[in-house]
Design a protein with these regions (language model features):
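Ser/Thr/Asn(+Pro)-rich, low-complexity disordered segments
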Residues: 98-100, 109, 131-134, 140-141, ...
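A structural signal for short secondary-structure junctions
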Residues: 17, 84-87, 105-109, 144-145
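Catalytic cores of carbohydrate-active enzymes
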Residues: 1-66, 115-147, 173
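Structural helix-adjacent loops and short alpha-helical linkers that scaffold large soluble proteins
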Residues: 27-41, 95-110, 155-168
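C-terminal substrate/ligand-recognition segments
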Residues: 68-102, 151-155
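Acidic, low-complexity intrinsically disordered tails
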Residues: 169-176
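Short amphipathic alpha-helical interaction segments
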Residues: 79-83, 101, 105, 117, ...
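Extracellular low-complexity, Gly/Ser/Thr-rich intrinsically disordered linkers
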Residues: 90, 102, 106-116, 148-149
């Protein structure tokens, strides 16, 4: 899906970004259901990492694999590849709409956060990560929206149970 239509100078932006997942994940999706599967597949193949979704796919113009350097360099990378942990929530929502009987795969998408609970800020999840391995945590080391979306997704993948033993359940997730 285009990220921007009728943008600057009338140009459409066809860069692969995570915004397209919202067209499916919303309570009332705005994308025709016949298009859900291809969007999910593209996001899974090009944007999904063990710690969230990249803000821009590798190979796209201006892609930045690392969020480092001086302030100007970090600002340039912020939305050009940097992984946002909180985006795992909308991805899991969309995945479960397309694959309602595949909670196991949805749970596996959360497996990369297991190690994050023991690094950066123990018991929490960082705001952002580098876009390439080893997915170094960056930004705020204890980001509320990152934690909230991982926990919300964990509850969804466990069939909606309200009580979740966070550390134990995340630790039980196997990652391929």
């Amino acid at each position: 899906l285009y990220d921007v239509v009728d943008g600057e100078n009338g140009r459409d932006d066809c860069a692969c970004r995570p915004n397209q997942i919202f067209a499916i994940s919303l309570d009332h999706p705005i994308l025709d259901q016949a298009r859900w599967q291809p969007v999910i597949q593209i996001v899974k193949d090009r944007l999904l990492t063990p710690v969230g979704l990249r803000s821009l796919a590798p190979g796209e113009h201006d892609y930045k694999p690392r969020y480092d350097g001086d302030l100007r360099a970090r600002d340039a990378a912020y939305h050009q590849g940097t992984v946002w942990a909180w985006l795992i929530g909308p991805f899991v929502d969309a995945w479960l709409k397309v694959h309602p009987d595949d909670r196991a795969s949805a749970a596996e998408f959360l497996g990369g956060f297991r190690s994050q609970l023991r690094t950066a800020c123990v018991g929490s999840i960082s705001e952002i990560f580098d876009a390439e391995p080893p997915y170094t945590p960056r930004g705020c080391c204890a980001q509320a929206w990152s934690v909230a979306e991982v926990l919300r997704s964990l509850v969804k993948t466990r069939g909606g149970r309200e009580k979740v033993e966070t550390t134990n359940e995340l630790s039980s997730v196997t990652v391929a």
